[in-house]
């Protein structure tokens, strides 16, 4: 069985959980409490020297970086593909996914937020202001990209889930957690609303994880 080492609120781990659920794969969650720095323990660093989640264990091998893990799963289990068959369409989906995962998320991940608070002395209000600013900086262009794509489907690209949706939903979740106003992003809001009616997204949500009460 596939094992995913992660933290319930990690956006990167959340992405992988969504992919696993969309593909209806059997998987086991191995919680790693980032608040307690369990990712810095030698036993974890042996499998990921970066000390980051998620880590996927598959057939005795360990894989890191959420997008690499998801593409590995997509190739290993081609049913319910997360990337389109056309080369142009694949590039468009990857472009949007990378925009979220590589440009938006790194500015607001837990490591950054902890540094802002512990090292720079920002208050919770200032930290939220930081988060909201960078969400707006990312979601503005993303909303335009979605509108310009010409797709009116229920997902980022038409009527099928893709890597773009897998990346978008965790970012929206965390934006809402930090009280970000989504009223200016109706396309993003509609995708979020639809995805959260689906079992795969519900099962992958942070609140549904066994470590959701972790302190």
Question: Where would I find each of the regions flagged by the language model?
Answer:
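GST-like domain detector, emphasizing the conserved glutathione-binding G-site
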Residues: 1-127
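Residue-level detector of short coil/turn "hinge" positions at structural boundaries
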Residues: 27, 34, 182, 202-203
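Short, solvent-exposed turn/loop segments enriched in Gly/Ser/Thr/Pro and often Arg
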Residues: 33, 163, 208
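Positions that flank functional sites
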Residues: 34-35, 190, 210-211
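Short Asp/Glu-rich motifs
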Residues: 38-40, 194, 214-215
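Phosphate-coordinating loops and pocket residues in cytosolic domains that bind phosphorylated ligands
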Residues: 46, 197, 206
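GST-like fold's C-terminal all-alpha helical module
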Residues: 100-197
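Terminal-tail/helix-coil boundary detector
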Residues: 201-215
